[in-house]
Structures are given as structure tokens and as C-alpha cells.
Amino acid sequence: MDYYERLTAEMAARDRSQPLLLAGDFNIAPSEFDVWNHRYMSKVVSHTPGEVDTLNRLQAAGGFSDVVRDAFPEPQKLASWWSYRAQDFRKSNRGLRLDHLWASPGLTPKVVPGSATIHDTVREWTQPSDHCPITVDLDV
């Protein structure tokens, strides 16, 4: 969590008007709609109250918009990761949204509304990653 604290300080100090896309595997599912079972997962690494609070502070420090959540508002459940342990990830449906695309206030106007996509069909490939690619269109 030290990394996130340092990143939060860095994001708080930067000029929010400058375009920035903060993207990647954050390994934290911030919302009850980003996990398959909120009650169970709140006791498991990746969705504990401390982790969620840390990620929320990072998002607030940079004034970031969550472009994936903007495209798919709550209460829609979202996931970008499924364990290899499940033979059929769709049938077990125990996914987490650990991968994120956040736009700074300087970039948000360039995000094409509704263009964010979680490419979950990649999980159907032979020997795929346990994470799905996420894309968004930018009008630059």
C-alpha cells in the first residue's frame, strides 16, 4: 500500500488540467459492484475496506474519472479478472474488476462517451491471461 500512498501524493501535486490516463492492474476492486460477492470479498485481499479507501484517496487526489464505470454505471456488475481455478469463468462468474482506466480532468473531455470496453472474450482463448484488456477511445 506504500506505493499507492506515494502515487497519491504525486497525483495531488500535479496539474490536473494536464491530460493523464492512469491505467493498469491496480489489484483493487473499489466498489461492491466490482466483486462477485461484496460481503465475502470485503475480507479478502483486493477488496478490503483499507484497500478500497486507499484507492478512493488516489482517485480523489488526481480528480480522476473512472472511464469504465462512466460507461457502465452502477449497479451493473463488472469484472476484468477471473481466477484460473474455475474451468468455466462465465459459469462460476466470480470475477473482480481489478483493472482500471482513469482520466484526469484535463483528459476527461477527450474520452469518447461510452467507448470503454472490457474485452472479456479474451478469457475464452487458449491459455489466456487471467486479466482482460480494457480499451477506451480518445478524441485527440
Task: Show where each model-derived region lies.
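A long, amphipathic alpha-helix that forms part
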Residues: 1-17
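Active-site metal-binding loops of divalent metal-dependent hydrolases
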Residues: 19, 26, 132
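Amphipathic alpha-helical interface surfaces
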Residues: 3, 7, 22, 51-54
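Short, well-ordered beta-to-alpha junction loops that form the rim of enzyme active sites
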Residues: 23-31
